[in-house]
Amino acid sequence: MFGARFDPTADDSSSDESEEESEEEENENENVVNNDVAKDIDSVESEESEDSDHSNDPNDAMDVDSEVNTEVDVDYVSKYKSVFDKFKKSVPETKKIDSESSSEEEDDVEMQDLMPLPQPALPRDKRLISSNSHLKNLDWLATPIYASPEDSKPFSEFEISPFLLKNLERDNFTTAFSVQIAIMDILLHDIKRNRLEPDVKGDILVNAATGSGKTLAYSIPIIEALHNRVVPRVRAIVLVPTKPLINQVKATFVQLSRGTNLSVVSLRNDVSIKEEGIKIVNSPPDIIVSTPGRLVEHISNKSINLNSLQFLVIDEADRLLNQSFQNWCQVLISSLEGDVNIAEEWKITPQKLIFSATLTTDSGKLSALKFQKPRLVIVNDRKQLVNEIFNVPSSLSEYTIQFGTAKASIKPLILAKYLLENNKLSNVLIFTKSNEASIRLCKLLELMFGKLHPSMNIAYINSTNNKSAIRTKILKDFSTQKINILVATDLIARGIDILSITDVINYDLPNSSREYVHRVGRTARANQTGHAYTLCFGKGEAKWFKKIISDVGRGDKTIEKVEIELKELIVAEDENVYNECLESLSKQVFH
Protein backbone atom coordinates (compact mmCIF):
# COMPACT_ATOMS: atom_id res chain seq x y z
CA MET A 1 0.00 0.00 0.00
CA PHE A 2 2.78 2.40 0.93
CA GLY A 3 4.74 1.34 -2.18
CA ALA A 4 2.04 2.75 -4.43
CA ARG A 5 2.96 6.27 -3.30
CA PHE A 6 6.27 6.11 -5.15
CA ASP A 7 4.88 4.54 -8.44
CA PRO A 8 4.13 7.35 -10.94
CA THR A 9 2.19 5.02 -13.23
CA ALA A 10 0.01 3.84 -10.45
CA ASP A 11 -0.67 7.39 -9.35
CA ASP A 12 -1.83 8.53 -12.79
CA SER A 13 -4.09 5.58 -13.35
CA SER A 14 -5.61 5.79 -9.91
CA SER A 15 -6.43 9.46 -10.32
CA ASP A 16 -8.28 8.90 -13.60
CA GLU A 17 -10.25 6.03 -12.20
CA SER A 18 -11.22 8.01 -9.10
CA GLU A 19 -12.59 10.87 -11.24
CA GLU A 20 -14.80 8.53 -13.25
CA GLU A 21 -16.02 6.77 -10.15
CA SER A 22 -16.92 10.04 -8.46
CA GLU A 23 -19.05 11.15 -11.44
CA GLU A 24 -20.91 7.85 -11.45
CA GLU A 25 -21.50 8.10 -7.73
CA GLU A 26 -22.96 11.60 -8.03
CA ASN A 27 -25.40 10.47 -10.69
CA GLU A 28 -26.48 7.53 -8.65
CA ASN A 29 -27.00 9.73 -5.61
CA GLU A 30 -29.23 12.13 -7.50
CA ASN A 31 -31.43 9.27 -8.57
CA VAL A 32 -31.66 7.71 -5.15
CA VAL A 33 -32.24 10.80 -3.03
CA ASN A 34 -35.44 12.77 -3.66
CA ASN A 35 -35.43 16.45 -4.33
CA ASP A 36 -36.56 17.42 -0.82
CA VAL A 37 -33.75 15.53 0.84
CA ALA A 38 -31.22 16.91 -1.60
CA LYS A 39 -32.18 20.47 -0.64
CA ASP A 40 -31.79 19.71 3.05
CA ILE A 41 -28.34 18.23 2.73
CA ASP A 42 -26.69 20.64 0.31
CA SER A 43 -24.19 21.66 2.88
CA VAL A 44 -23.35 18.07 3.68
CA GLU A 45 -22.80 17.24 -0.01
CA SER A 46 -20.54 20.20 -0.46
CA GLU A 47 -18.34 18.88 2.31
CA GLU A 48 -18.38 15.45 0.66
CA SER A 49 -17.29 16.92 -2.66
CA GLU A 50 -14.38 18.58 -0.94
CA ASP A 51 -13.45 15.22 0.52
CA SER A 52 -13.62 13.61 -2.94
CA ASP A 53 -11.37 16.33 -4.37
CA HIS A 54 -8.97 15.68 -1.59
CA SER A 55 -8.98 12.01 -2.52
CA ASN A 56 -7.48 12.91 -5.94
CA ASP A 57 -4.25 13.74 -4.20
CA PRO A 58 -1.63 11.41 -5.72
CA ASN A 59 -0.07 11.06 -2.30
CA ASP A 60 -3.27 9.84 -0.74
CA ALA A 61 -4.13 6.31 -1.71
CA MET A 62 -5.86 5.59 1.59
CA ASP A 63 -9.46 6.27 0.39
CA VAL A 64 -10.63 3.21 -1.44
CA ASP A 65 -14.14 1.92 -1.65
CA SER A 66 -15.47 5.46 -1.87
CA GLU A 67 -18.69 4.09 -3.22
CA VAL A 68 -19.35 2.22 -0.02
CA ASN A 69 -18.49 5.26 2.13
CA THR A 70 -20.82 7.51 0.18
CA GLU A 71 -23.71 5.15 0.53
CA VAL A 72 -23.14 4.93 4.29
CA ASP A 73 -23.07 8.76 4.61
CA VAL A 74 -26.31 9.16 2.69
CA ASP A 75 -28.04 6.58 4.79
CA TYR A 76 -26.70 8.29 7.95
CA VAL A 77 -28.05 11.68 6.88
CA SER A 78 -31.40 10.28 5.87
CA LYS A 79 -31.72 8.43 9.13
CA TYR A 80 -31.02 11.48 11.33
CA LYS A 81 -32.71 14.10 9.18
CA SER A 82 -34.75 15.50 12.06
CA VAL A 83 -31.62 16.04 14.12
CA PHE A 84 -29.98 18.02 11.35
CA ASP A 85 -33.14 20.09 10.90
CA LYS A 86 -33.00 21.11 14.55
CA PHE A 87 -29.32 21.90 14.24
CA LYS A 88 -29.92 24.26 11.29
CA LYS A 89 -32.62 26.09 13.22
CA SER A 90 -30.40 26.52 16.31
CA VAL A 91 -27.43 28.01 14.52
CA PRO A 92 -28.98 31.46 13.93
CA GLU A 93 -30.25 31.59 17.54
CA THR A 94 -26.77 30.80 18.85
CA LYS A 95 -25.25 33.56 16.73
CA LYS A 96 -27.87 35.98 18.02
CA ILE A 97 -27.15 35.12 21.68
CA ASP A 98 -23.40 35.41 21.13
CA SER A 99 -23.83 38.84 19.60
CA GLU A 100 -26.01 40.02 22.52
CA SER A 101 -23.53 38.72 25.12
CA SER A 102 -20.64 40.44 23.38
CA SER A 103 -22.54 43.72 23.40
CA GLU A 104 -23.27 43.34 27.12
CA GLU A 105 -19.60 42.75 27.86
CA GLU A 106 -18.78 46.00 26.13
CA ASP A 107 -21.03 47.95 28.51
CA ASP A 108 -19.36 49.78 31.40
CA VAL A 109 -19.11 47.63 34.56
CA GLU A 110 -20.17 49.35 37.78
CA MET A 111 -17.31 49.40 40.32
CA GLN A 112 -18.01 48.02 43.81
CA ASP A 113 -16.16 48.43 47.14
CA LEU A 114 -14.31 45.50 48.68
CA MET A 115 -16.76 44.73 51.43
CA PRO A 116 -18.88 41.75 52.49
CA LEU A 117 -22.18 41.41 50.80
CA PRO A 118 -25.20 41.92 53.05
CA GLN A 119 -26.60 38.64 54.30
CA PRO A 120 -30.09 37.88 55.57
CA ALA A 121 -30.50 37.24 59.29
CA LEU A 122 -30.19 33.62 60.28
CA PRO A 123 -33.45 32.05 61.36
CA ARG A 124 -33.67 31.22 65.06
CA ASP A 125 -35.64 28.42 66.56
CA LYS A 126 -36.87 29.88 69.82
CA ARG A 127 -38.02 26.49 70.96
CA LEU A 128 -34.42 25.33 71.36
CA ILE A 129 -32.97 26.67 74.63
CA SER A 130 -29.52 25.73 75.88
CA SER A 131 -29.54 23.77 79.12
CA ASN A 132 -26.60 25.93 80.28
CA SER A 133 -28.24 29.27 79.50
CA HIS A 134 -28.60 29.97 83.24
CA LEU A 135 -24.80 30.10 83.52
CA LYS A 136 -24.70 33.14 81.25
CA ASN A 137 -27.37 34.99 83.17
CA LEU A 138 -25.84 37.17 85.86
CA ASP A 139 -28.98 39.08 86.80
CA TRP A 140 -28.87 37.50 90.26
CA LEU A 141 -25.69 39.48 90.99
CA ALA A 142 -27.51 42.73 90.33
CA THR A 143 -30.64 41.82 92.31
CA PRO A 144 -29.49 40.42 95.69
CA ILE A 145 -31.68 39.73 98.70
CA TYR A 146 -30.77 42.15 101.51
CA ALA A 147 -31.22 41.32 105.19
CA SER A 148 -30.82 43.75 108.06
CA PRO A 149 -28.12 42.81 110.61
CA GLU A 150 -30.49 43.81 113.44
CA ASP A 151 -33.09 41.14 112.61
CA SER A 152 -33.75 38.43 115.21
CA LYS A 153 -36.28 35.64 115.66
CA PRO A 154 -36.74 32.80 118.20
CA PHE A 155 -35.81 29.36 116.89
CA SER A 156 -39.14 28.08 118.18
CA GLU A 157 -40.93 30.02 115.43
CA PHE A 158 -39.23 28.01 112.68
CA GLU A 159 -40.74 24.78 111.33
CA ILE A 160 -38.02 22.48 112.65
CA SER A 161 -38.19 19.17 114.50
CA PRO A 162 -38.57 19.10 118.31
CA PHE A 163 -35.24 17.31 118.79
CA LEU A 164 -33.48 20.18 117.00
CA LEU A 165 -35.10 22.76 119.26
CA LYS A 166 -34.09 20.72 122.29
CA ASN A 167 -30.46 20.48 121.12
CA LEU A 168 -30.36 24.22 120.41
CA GLU A 169 -31.71 25.08 123.85
CA ARG A 170 -29.22 22.71 125.48
CA ASP A 171 -26.39 24.75 123.90
CA ASN A 172 -28.08 28.05 124.89
CA PHE A 173 -29.16 28.92 121.34
CA THR A 174 -32.63 30.44 121.64
CA THR A 175 -32.65 33.33 119.17
CA ALA A 176 -31.68 33.28 115.50
CA PHE A 177 -29.61 36.13 114.10
CA SER A 178 -30.04 37.88 110.78
CA VAL A 179 -28.06 35.50 108.56
CA GLN A 180 -29.71 32.48 110.20
CA ILE A 181 -33.18 33.90 109.63
CA ALA A 182 -32.51 34.71 105.97
CA ILE A 183 -30.96 31.35 105.10
CA MET A 184 -33.22 29.13 107.19
CA ASP A 185 -36.34 30.71 105.70
CA ILE A 186 -35.08 29.89 102.19
CA LEU A 187 -33.65 26.44 102.89
CA LEU A 188 -36.51 25.15 105.03
CA HIS A 189 -38.96 26.21 102.33
CA ASP A 190 -36.86 24.47 99.66
CA ILE A 191 -36.67 21.30 101.76
CA LYS A 192 -40.42 21.22 102.33
CA ARG A 193 -41.16 21.82 98.65
CA ASN A 194 -38.58 19.30 97.48
CA ARG A 195 -40.35 16.45 99.25
CA LEU A 196 -43.09 16.74 96.64
CA GLU A 197 -41.12 18.29 93.76
CA PRO A 198 -37.66 16.75 93.37
CA ASP A 199 -36.48 19.51 91.04
CA VAL A 200 -33.49 21.85 91.14
CA LYS A 201 -34.01 24.08 94.17
CA GLY A 202 -31.43 26.72 93.32
CA ASP A 203 -28.03 27.54 94.82
CA ILE A 204 -27.48 30.18 97.51
CA LEU A 205 -24.59 32.61 97.99
CA VAL A 206 -24.36 34.38 101.35
CA ASN A 207 -22.34 37.43 102.31
CA ALA A 208 -22.42 38.02 106.06
CA ALA A 209 -19.95 39.36 108.58
CA THR A 210 -17.68 36.88 110.29
CA GLY A 211 -19.05 35.74 113.63
CA SER A 212 -22.66 36.28 112.54
CA GLY A 213 -23.60 32.60 112.92
CA LYS A 214 -23.17 31.22 109.40
CA THR A 215 -22.39 27.70 110.65
CA LEU A 216 -25.77 27.36 112.36
CA ALA A 217 -27.45 28.91 109.33
CA TYR A 218 -26.60 25.93 107.12
CA SER A 219 -26.20 23.12 109.70
CA ILE A 220 -29.76 23.39 111.09
CA PRO A 221 -31.50 22.98 107.68
CA ILE A 222 -29.15 20.14 106.69
CA ILE A 223 -29.91 18.20 109.90
CA GLU A 224 -33.62 18.87 109.40
CA ALA A 225 -33.48 17.53 105.83
CA LEU A 226 -31.45 14.39 106.60
CA HIS A 227 -32.58 13.21 110.04
CA ASN A 228 -35.24 10.85 108.61
CA ARG A 229 -32.93 9.12 106.16
CA VAL A 230 -33.04 5.29 106.08
CA VAL A 231 -29.86 4.20 104.29
CA PRO A 232 -26.61 5.95 105.27
CA ARG A 233 -24.98 7.62 102.26
CA VAL A 234 -22.91 10.73 101.70
CA ARG A 235 -25.62 13.39 101.47
CA ALA A 236 -23.85 16.55 102.66
CA ILE A 237 -20.27 17.81 102.28
CA VAL A 238 -18.90 20.91 104.02
CA LEU A 239 -15.61 22.37 102.77
CA VAL A 240 -13.53 24.69 104.97
CA PRO A 241 -9.98 26.03 104.53
CA THR A 242 -8.30 25.01 107.81
CA LYS A 243 -8.13 22.16 110.33
CA PRO A 244 -9.47 24.24 113.26
CA LEU A 245 -12.56 25.09 111.24
CA ILE A 246 -13.04 21.40 110.48
CA ASN A 247 -13.18 20.66 114.21
CA GLN A 248 -15.55 23.55 114.91
CA VAL A 249 -17.99 22.67 112.11
CA LYS A 250 -17.96 18.97 112.98
CA ALA A 251 -18.65 19.76 116.65
CA THR A 252 -21.65 21.87 115.63
CA PHE A 253 -23.13 19.07 113.50
CA VAL A 254 -22.56 16.49 116.24
CA GLN A 255 -24.29 18.66 118.83
CA LEU A 256 -27.29 19.38 116.60
CA SER A 257 -27.72 15.75 115.47
CA ARG A 258 -28.00 14.30 118.98
CA GLY A 259 -30.92 11.89 119.09
CA THR A 260 -30.61 10.86 115.43
CA ASN A 261 -28.73 8.15 113.55
CA LEU A 262 -26.81 10.64 111.42
CA SER A 263 -23.08 10.03 111.11
CA VAL A 264 -20.69 13.00 110.88
CA VAL A 265 -17.09 12.42 109.77
CA SER A 266 -14.16 14.80 109.37
CA LEU A 267 -11.37 13.96 106.91
CA ARG A 268 -7.94 14.39 108.50
CA ASN A 269 -4.50 14.62 106.97
CA ASP A 270 -2.86 12.82 109.90
CA VAL A 271 -4.56 9.54 108.91
CA SER A 272 -3.61 7.29 106.00
CA ILE A 273 -5.72 8.12 102.95
CA LYS A 274 -6.09 4.41 102.19
CA GLU A 275 -7.29 3.48 105.69
CA GLU A 276 -9.64 6.44 105.78
CA GLY A 277 -11.05 5.47 102.38
CA ILE A 278 -11.70 1.88 103.48
CA LYS A 279 -13.65 3.11 106.52
CA ILE A 280 -15.76 5.43 104.36
CA VAL A 281 -16.55 2.65 101.87
CA ASN A 282 -17.44 0.14 104.59
CA SER A 283 -19.44 2.62 106.66
CA PRO A 284 -20.60 5.60 104.55
CA PRO A 285 -21.19 8.76 106.63
CA ASP A 286 -24.10 11.12 106.10
CA ILE A 287 -22.11 14.34 106.51
CA ILE A 288 -18.44 14.94 105.65
CA VAL A 289 -16.43 17.95 106.82
CA SER A 290 -13.11 18.38 105.04
CA THR A 291 -10.63 20.60 103.28
CA PRO A 292 -10.84 20.59 99.46
CA GLY A 293 -7.50 18.84 98.94
CA ARG A 294 -8.34 15.86 101.14
CA LEU A 295 -11.76 15.48 99.52
CA VAL A 296 -10.28 15.51 96.01
CA GLU A 297 -7.89 12.71 96.99
CA HIS A 298 -10.81 10.51 98.05
CA ILE A 299 -12.75 11.36 94.89
CA SER A 300 -9.74 10.39 92.77
CA ASN A 301 -9.49 7.10 94.68
CA LYS A 302 -13.26 6.57 94.24
CA SER A 303 -13.73 6.00 97.96
CA ILE A 304 -16.52 8.61 98.14
CA ASN A 305 -19.71 8.20 96.11
CA LEU A 306 -21.37 11.52 95.28
CA ASN A 307 -24.50 10.15 93.58
CA SER A 308 -26.67 10.78 96.67
CA LEU A 309 -25.21 14.18 97.55
CA GLN A 310 -27.89 16.75 98.40
CA PHE A 311 -25.89 19.63 99.90
CA LEU A 312 -22.47 21.05 99.05
CA VAL A 313 -21.41 23.78 101.50
CA ILE A 314 -18.35 25.94 100.83
CA ASP A 315 -17.51 27.97 103.93
CA GLU A 316 -14.95 30.80 103.72
CA ALA A 317 -15.49 30.62 99.96
CA ASP A 318 -13.28 33.59 99.09
CA ARG A 319 -10.23 31.84 100.49
CA LEU A 320 -11.07 28.44 98.98
CA LEU A 321 -11.72 29.86 95.50
CA ASN A 322 -8.28 31.46 95.57
CA GLN A 323 -6.71 28.05 96.20
CA SER A 324 -5.86 25.84 93.23
CA PHE A 325 -4.58 22.83 95.17
CA GLN A 326 -5.05 19.77 92.93
CA ASN A 327 -7.47 21.89 90.87
CA TRP A 328 -10.07 20.91 93.47
CA CYS A 329 -12.96 22.97 92.12
CA GLN A 330 -12.88 21.52 88.61
CA VAL A 331 -12.43 17.95 89.89
CA LEU A 332 -15.31 18.26 92.36
CA ILE A 333 -17.79 19.93 90.00
CA SER A 334 -17.00 17.54 87.14
CA SER A 335 -17.59 14.62 89.52
CA LEU A 336 -20.97 16.03 90.48
CA GLU A 337 -21.93 16.47 86.82
CA GLY A 338 -20.96 12.97 85.72
CA ASP A 339 -23.12 11.36 83.03
CA VAL A 340 -25.88 9.18 84.46
CA ASN A 341 -28.54 7.18 82.65
CA ILE A 342 -31.67 8.53 84.33
CA ALA A 343 -33.65 5.59 82.94
CA GLU A 344 -31.65 3.33 85.25
CA GLU A 345 -30.72 5.65 88.11
CA TRP A 346 -32.23 8.88 89.43
CA LYS A 347 -29.51 11.38 90.35
CA ILE A 348 -30.27 14.33 92.60
CA THR A 349 -28.74 17.69 91.73
CA PRO A 350 -26.97 18.90 94.90
CA GLN A 351 -27.74 22.34 96.23
CA LYS A 352 -24.64 24.54 96.60
CA LEU A 353 -24.42 26.83 99.64
CA ILE A 354 -21.63 29.43 99.47
CA PHE A 355 -20.72 31.44 102.59
CA SER A 356 -18.15 34.17 103.13
CA ALA A 357 -17.61 37.38 105.04
CA THR A 358 -15.79 38.78 102.00
CA LEU A 359 -17.72 37.26 99.12
CA THR A 360 -16.36 37.99 95.68
CA THR A 361 -18.73 38.90 92.85
CA ASP A 362 -16.11 38.14 90.22
CA SER A 363 -18.05 36.07 87.69
CA GLY A 364 -14.79 34.52 86.48
CA LYS A 365 -14.23 32.90 89.88
CA LEU A 366 -17.86 32.08 90.58
CA SER A 367 -18.47 30.49 87.16
CA ALA A 368 -16.21 27.57 88.11
CA LEU A 369 -18.89 26.41 90.56
CA LYS A 370 -21.54 26.25 87.79
CA PHE A 371 -24.48 27.56 89.77
CA GLN A 372 -28.07 26.69 88.97
CA LYS A 373 -30.78 29.27 89.67
CA PRO A 374 -28.49 31.12 92.14
CA ARG A 375 -29.71 33.56 94.77
CA LEU A 376 -27.46 36.11 96.49
CA VAL A 377 -28.16 37.03 100.12
CA ILE A 378 -26.35 40.02 101.66
CA VAL A 379 -26.59 40.77 105.37
CA ASN A 380 -25.87 44.48 105.42
CA ASP A 381 -27.59 47.82 105.97
CA ARG A 382 -25.90 49.34 102.93
CA LYS A 383 -27.73 48.16 99.83
CA GLN A 384 -24.78 48.48 97.52
CA LEU A 385 -23.09 45.91 95.32
CA VAL A 386 -19.39 46.18 94.52
CA ASN A 387 -16.81 43.81 93.08
CA GLU A 388 -15.88 42.57 96.55
CA ILE A 389 -18.45 42.59 99.33
CA PHE A 390 -16.83 43.31 102.71
CA ASN A 391 -18.80 43.73 105.92
CA VAL A 392 -17.91 43.99 109.59
CA PRO A 393 -20.26 43.05 112.46
CA SER A 394 -22.83 45.69 113.26
CA SER A 395 -21.94 45.49 116.97
CA LEU A 396 -18.27 46.29 116.29
CA SER A 397 -16.70 49.65 117.17
CA GLU A 398 -13.60 50.61 115.16
CA TYR A 399 -10.80 52.96 116.18
CA THR A 400 -7.51 54.18 114.77
CA ILE A 401 -4.46 55.38 116.72
CA GLN A 402 -2.06 57.50 114.66
CA PHE A 403 1.44 58.81 115.36
CA GLY A 404 4.30 60.24 113.35
CA THR A 405 6.99 58.04 111.81
CA ALA A 406 9.53 59.10 114.46
CA LYS A 407 7.51 57.37 117.18
CA ALA A 408 7.65 53.95 115.46
CA SER A 409 10.77 53.10 117.50
CA ILE A 410 8.70 52.95 120.70
CA LYS A 411 5.67 51.26 119.13
CA PRO A 412 5.67 48.26 121.56
CA LEU A 413 5.89 50.63 124.53
CA ILE A 414 2.94 52.71 123.26
CA LEU A 415 0.87 49.54 122.88
CA ALA A 416 1.72 48.24 126.36
CA LYS A 417 1.02 51.57 128.07
CA TYR A 418 -2.28 52.05 126.19
CA LEU A 419 -3.50 48.60 127.29
CA LEU A 420 -2.54 49.34 130.90
CA GLU A 421 -4.09 52.82 130.98
CA ASN A 422 -7.39 51.62 129.45
CA ASN A 423 -7.57 48.43 131.55
CA LYS A 424 -7.54 46.14 128.51
CA LEU A 425 -5.70 43.35 130.26
CA SER A 426 -7.63 40.25 129.16
CA ASN A 427 -9.43 38.82 126.11
CA VAL A 428 -7.16 40.87 123.83
CA LEU A 429 -6.06 39.52 120.42
CA ILE A 430 -3.15 41.25 118.66
CA PHE A 431 -2.31 40.73 114.97
CA THR A 432 1.16 41.07 113.48
CA LYS A 433 2.46 40.71 109.92
CA SER A 434 4.70 37.63 110.31
CA ASN A 435 5.75 34.74 112.53
CA GLU A 436 8.94 36.54 113.54
CA ALA A 437 7.06 39.72 114.42
CA SER A 438 4.52 37.83 116.54
CA ILE A 439 7.21 36.00 118.53
CA ARG A 440 9.27 39.16 119.03
CA LEU A 441 6.28 41.23 120.19
CA CYS A 442 5.10 38.47 122.52
CA LYS A 443 8.52 38.20 124.21
CA LEU A 444 8.86 41.97 124.48
CA LEU A 445 5.39 42.39 126.01
CA GLU A 446 6.15 39.60 128.49
CA LEU A 447 9.29 41.43 129.59
CA MET A 448 7.56 44.82 129.86
CA PHE A 449 4.44 43.56 131.64
CA GLY A 450 6.70 41.58 133.96
CA LYS A 451 7.92 44.91 135.31
CA LEU A 452 4.80 47.03 134.79
CA HIS A 453 2.08 44.46 135.63
CA PRO A 454 3.53 41.13 136.84
CA SER A 455 0.25 39.16 136.80
CA MET A 456 -0.15 39.30 132.98
CA ASN A 457 0.17 36.12 130.91
CA ILE A 458 0.95 36.54 127.19
CA ALA A 459 1.28 33.90 124.45
CA TYR A 460 1.59 33.72 120.67
CA ILE A 461 0.15 31.44 118.00
CA ASN A 462 1.36 31.15 114.41
CA SER A 463 2.43 28.52 111.90
CA THR A 464 5.42 27.53 114.04
CA ASN A 465 3.24 26.18 116.88
CA ASN A 466 0.06 25.36 114.98
CA LYS A 467 -0.06 21.64 115.73
CA SER A 468 -3.46 20.43 116.83
CA ALA A 469 -2.59 19.65 120.45
CA ILE A 470 -0.62 22.86 121.05
CA ARG A 471 -3.16 25.03 119.28
CA THR A 472 -6.10 23.50 121.13
CA LYS A 473 -4.44 24.09 124.50
CA ILE A 474 -3.51 27.71 123.69
CA LEU A 475 -7.01 28.61 122.48
CA LYS A 476 -8.61 26.87 125.45
CA ASP A 477 -6.39 28.75 127.90
CA PHE A 478 -7.13 32.00 126.06
CA SER A 479 -10.90 31.43 126.20
CA THR A 480 -10.72 30.70 129.95
CA GLN A 481 -8.48 33.76 130.51
CA LYS A 482 -5.49 31.74 131.64
CA ILE A 483 -3.83 33.61 128.78
CA ASN A 484 -4.65 37.33 128.91
CA ILE A 485 -3.21 38.51 125.60
CA LEU A 486 -2.70 36.40 122.48
CA VAL A 487 -0.44 37.53 119.62
CA ALA A 488 -1.31 35.95 116.25
CA THR A 489 -0.79 36.17 112.49
CA ASP A 490 -3.23 36.36 109.57
CA LEU A 491 -2.63 32.72 108.74
CA ILE A 492 -4.71 31.49 111.67
CA ALA A 493 -7.07 34.48 111.94
CA ARG A 494 -10.03 32.60 110.47
CA GLY A 495 -9.58 29.63 112.77
CA ILE A 496 -10.17 31.52 116.02
CA ASP A 497 -13.79 31.32 117.13
CA ILE A 498 -13.88 32.52 120.74
CA LEU A 499 -16.89 34.51 121.87
CA SER A 500 -15.08 36.01 124.85
CA ILE A 501 -12.68 38.15 122.76
CA THR A 502 -13.48 41.80 123.48
CA ASP A 503 -10.64 43.65 121.74
CA VAL A 504 -8.68 43.15 118.51
CA ILE A 505 -5.57 45.23 117.84
CA ASN A 506 -3.94 45.57 114.43
CA TYR A 507 -0.36 46.08 115.56
CA ASP A 508 0.77 45.77 111.93
CA LEU A 509 -1.53 46.91 109.13
CA PRO A 510 -3.36 44.19 107.18
CA ASN A 511 -2.50 43.68 103.52
CA SER A 512 -6.04 44.07 102.18
CA SER A 513 -9.63 44.85 103.02
CA ARG A 514 -10.35 41.13 103.16
CA GLU A 515 -7.70 40.50 105.82
CA TYR A 516 -8.90 43.49 107.80
CA VAL A 517 -12.45 42.14 107.88
CA HIS A 518 -11.30 38.71 109.03
CA ARG A 519 -9.05 40.19 111.69
CA VAL A 520 -11.60 42.46 113.33
CA GLY A 521 -14.26 39.77 112.90
CA ARG A 522 -12.65 37.76 115.72
CA THR A 523 -14.55 40.02 118.11
CA ALA A 524 -18.18 41.21 118.21
CA ARG A 525 -19.30 37.67 117.38
CA ALA A 526 -22.89 36.50 117.80
CA ASN A 527 -24.12 40.10 118.17
CA GLN A 528 -21.88 40.76 121.18
CA THR A 529 -20.06 44.07 121.46
CA GLY A 530 -16.43 44.31 120.41
CA HIS A 531 -13.67 46.84 119.72
CA ALA A 532 -11.02 46.96 117.00
CA TYR A 533 -7.95 49.23 117.14
CA THR A 534 -5.51 49.90 114.30
CA LEU A 535 -2.08 51.48 114.88
CA CYS A 536 -0.78 53.77 112.11
CA PHE A 537 2.70 55.32 112.21
CA GLY A 538 3.40 57.90 109.52
CA LYS A 539 1.37 59.35 106.64
CA GLY A 540 2.03 56.31 104.43
CA GLU A 541 0.38 53.87 106.81
CA ALA A 542 -2.50 56.26 107.46
CA LYS A 543 -3.11 56.59 103.72
CA TRP A 544 -3.01 52.82 103.21
CA PHE A 545 -5.41 52.21 106.09
CA LYS A 546 -7.84 54.76 104.68
CA LYS A 547 -7.74 52.95 101.35
CA ILE A 548 -8.43 49.44 102.62
CA ILE A 549 -11.32 50.48 104.88
CA SER A 550 -13.11 52.41 102.13
CA ASP A 551 -14.56 49.19 100.67
CA VAL A 552 -15.82 47.84 104.00
CA GLY A 553 -19.49 48.08 104.87
CA ARG A 554 -20.27 49.14 108.44
CA GLY A 555 -23.74 50.66 108.18
CA ASP A 556 -24.00 54.19 109.54
CA LYS A 557 -20.95 53.79 111.78
CA THR A 558 -17.58 55.46 111.24
CA ILE A 559 -14.04 54.79 112.45
CA GLU A 560 -13.15 56.99 115.39
CA LYS A 561 -9.69 58.47 115.84
CA VAL A 562 -8.21 58.08 119.32
CA GLU A 563 -6.24 61.13 120.46
CA ILE A 564 -3.32 60.27 122.77
CA GLU A 565 -0.89 62.65 124.44
CA LEU A 566 2.42 60.78 124.57
CA LYS A 567 3.79 63.04 127.29
CA GLU A 568 0.98 61.96 129.57
CA LEU A 569 1.02 58.31 128.45
CA ILE A 570 4.77 57.66 128.62
CA VAL A 571 7.12 59.00 131.26
CA ALA A 572 10.91 58.77 131.50
CA GLU A 573 10.74 55.74 133.77
CA ASP A 574 8.69 53.87 131.16
CA GLU A 575 11.32 54.53 128.52
CA ASN A 576 14.02 53.20 130.82
CA VAL A 577 12.02 50.01 131.38
CA TYR A 578 11.52 49.67 127.63
CA ASN A 579 15.24 50.02 126.90
CA GLU A 580 16.08 47.42 129.56
CA CYS A 581 13.58 45.02 128.00
CA LEU A 582 15.12 45.54 124.55
CA GLU A 583 18.57 44.69 125.91
CA SER A 584 17.22 41.62 127.67
CA LEU A 585 15.49 40.48 124.47
CA SER A 586 18.65 40.90 122.42
CA LYS A 587 20.56 38.76 124.91
CA GLN A 588 17.93 36.01 124.63
CA VAL A 589 18.17 36.08 120.85
CA PHE A 590 21.96 36.17 120.45
CA HIS A 591 22.99 34.04 123.42
From Swiss-Prot:
**Which InterPro entries does the entry link to?**
DEAD/DEAH_box_helicase_dom, DEAD_box_RNA_helicase, Helicase_ATP-bd, Helicase_C-like, P-loop_NTPase, RNA-helicase_DEAD-box_CS
**Which residues belong to any copy of the Helicase ATP-binding domain?**
195-377
One MF annotation (Gene Ontology) recorded for this entry = RNA helicase activity
Q: Where is the composition biased (Acidic residues)?
A: 9-29, 60-70
Instruction: Indicate the enzyme's highest-level EC class.
Output: hydrolase
Q: Name one GO cellular component term.
A: preribosome, large subunit precursor
Name this protein carries in UniProt: ATP-dependent RNA helicase DBP6
Native species of this protein? Scheffersomyces stipitis (strain ATCC 58785 / CBS 6054 / NBRC 10063 / NRRL Y-11545) (Yeast)
Instruction: Quote the gene name from the UniProt entry.
Output: DBP6
